[in-house]
Amino acid sequence: MGSGFLDDMGSFRIEHGEKNRLNYFPLAAENGVMASITPELKGDLKRDQNSFVLPPASEEDLRSGMAGRNFWCRFENGELWSAAGMSAAQIAEEFTPAEEKCIVEAGLLWHRTVRENRTRQLRAAVTSWVPSANGTVEIMQVMLENCGEETLRLTPTAAIPLYGRSADNLRDHRHVTSLLNRAESRKEGVILTPTYSFDERGHTPNQRSYFVFGITEDGKSAEAVCADLDRYTGEGSLIMPEWVAKELPGDSLGGETAGKETIGALRFPETELRPGEKREYDILVGTAEDKAAAEQIAAVWLSLYRIRISLEETKLWWDQVNPIRTHTGDSDFDNILRWIGIQPTLRRIYGCSFLPHHDYGKGGRGWRDLWQDSLGLLLSEPETVADDLVAYFGGVRLDGTNATIIGNRPGEFKADRNGIQRVWMDHGYWPVLTIWQYIQQTGDIEILLRVAPFFQDGLGMRGTQRDAIQAKRSCTGTVAEHMLLEQLTAFCEAGEHGLLRLRDADWNDALDMAPQRGESGAFTSAYAGSMELLAKMLETLRQTGKCSSIDLPKRFAILLGEEDNWASIASRREKLNRFCTQCIQIPDDDRIQIPLDKIVRHLDLCADTLKAIIREKAWIQTEQDGWFNSYYDNYGTPLECGTPGQERMMLTGQVFTILGGVATKSEIPQIYHAARRLLYARQAGGFRLNTRLNPEDFQIGRMLAFAYGHKENGAVFSHMSVMFAYALYSRGYAREGFSAIEPIWRLALDSEKSRIYPGIPEYFAPDGRGMYPYLTGSAAWMMLCVVQEMFGVRGENGALCLRPQLLPEQFDVRNRTSIILKFGGKAFKIVYTLLERLEPSEYTIVKAELDNMPIADGRILPSEMGALDKEKIHIVEAWLGRKVQ
């Protein structure tokens, strides 16, 4: 990736940023500030859908738009040069010998571009970050340096367009909404405060302000300010602005520009740079609740000392977001994990919107995003997420379906992004998986007895009837009840082959056109696994003696009944209909106690039933290998096929049959062989999501209308590839699992091909370009796979257990490898030594020590951890030797 990593903290350098103009980097903070920035300083800045500071930027805006952050240098002869590379002259030199080089350096979570005017020998380094401390602001630190032997005289000007309204207004009254603008020019810069928030359903008075402020390194303000975009560009453009080129007069300070598109253009005093001399300019861009709050930000942040301290504070804050550190035989792998480890936090901030590729939706995360991102957070601070996990169950409806969009606060839910009635059939799976991981990490089995509300929005009968429930009633239940409800209703929603109905989609959102006859073999297998996990959790709860039964609505007796033919398709459907009808008709205060052992036995029976159906109906055997059919389409026909010359295969079904325990030991090697033969493409990042399917068959979903190799139709989709790795590791196939994740991060780090910064994207396009970077659930699964399966550091009801599956090439030259992480509120450094070159299946822990004291079986009990010092890093050493046959 150009020059590669600069240290062991993930900081990196790319030599030719000008060749990656569409590459963007996130700048954000947990206070809600979200930004993106490119090597040309394009991108946007916002707080939410209705509060964009800079104009909204999609991928195409990065390519063709001119709007963005800019910093001009006007030399004595009138020549203009842009520190962003965005002047007419610089653009005209692209792809010629005179093209300007742009170096990009970045780290957690700061971004720097370095450009040099070779004629003038003037270098500009622009460092950008969003402070981790209070203040809804982005800071742009510009450092000019005279690298030549002659004195330079120049006039610097910062110029940043202020959009100041909703993204909706890009194509909805763009000009009309500009008439609401009121921009005040001040010595600090420009404050824009629109009079109203425009919405034809009801306009509301606006208080929110947007601003651009700036100072020199010696605390001086701009000598001229321009707030009117028309006056700034004149008869020029954003890449040749008349106000800068002609040094036109500034606005009257304290004056107001009304009804115009706004820019924060700040001209600083002419300066003289002697050879070797540097000069710093600091620009603040952001938003505040009102004008007074904006003025307060200026008072606090327009300080050279405060700004410089902020950069170091921000680096430290992001460094601590991901406390996991690895040391293997590959420093590139160790460094990219620093970036992958912060991706769940980035998705918590951005949701699934607000980066250039993610130009859909209006913020918020989806249901499964909520639970999967929590998996990543469980690795760093499991003790702090319990309240959030309980609150998340407030999105479950009484019929076992759920809200699909999550608001900004835990427990805040919306039915759907676009107000559409949709049911994703996989949604009941993820909470069980996450709660299982939480209990294993913490030993907090009593979370199952905590109480959460149910989501009520009028939808009933599994989302098929609107306004089915006329009046909201106060309904609550335990976490165990919520999970049991999701599992049992899913089991009863049977398709004609006995698999679970696909409904409006599963994990693959693009399988959205088979609501009548579609079935998901993939998530039938997943639910078989999650039912077994829930049964294990309830059995553990029973064995603690805390309770022998749980309180449930009386209607649960329908779902738990085991009358003759209880598992038949007809019986399952009839039960579901009766249950959902009673959800509407019968008050929830009619409750009964149901023994835990009865529930556990029933869940195991349901899991066994689903496994038997999958094994009987979904296995595809060929002469060379075999795999499981993942889906039935809306014709009721299998999507996959093993006929020679017509073979069709999808990865999703293989992941969940392995992970859910459906695939047997003899079938897993066959599945892997088939996946290597039909799906593997190393140059594209590893295992594709599917082979070519029938592009004319729209009886499964929109995915088949996508060009093959893109997104859900045949791309290397990181999320499922990483889950494939996790599934293989979980069943003891370490080398096979590593082969699924290694090509992903290798390609991601090859910036000439992937065109992205470190981290893993949602998928790779056919040419290897990483698409939709940063905001992907694959990051949490990658960290889970590395920590729990590769390094084998996992929880078992609160105990720390070591079960490593590291490959011999992952050890350093001393045959050692290590990981630093938190567990049980304590910090550990776990060091493995491989005594001879062995595969994971050949070695075991022959000796282990905690702080130089022996521990048995590589296991530290919760009682032992309780006595450990919270302030130190505890050293666990384990020696790996050959298993005794």
Task: Show which residues each predicted segment covers.
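Alpha-helix capping and helix-loop boundary segments enriched in small/acidic/polar residues
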Residues: 129-133, 361-365, 380, 415-426, ...
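Anionic coordination/interaction segments
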Residues: 1-371, 382-395, 422, 427, ...
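Conserved H-X4-D acyltransferase segment
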Residues: 142, 366-380, 653-662, 728
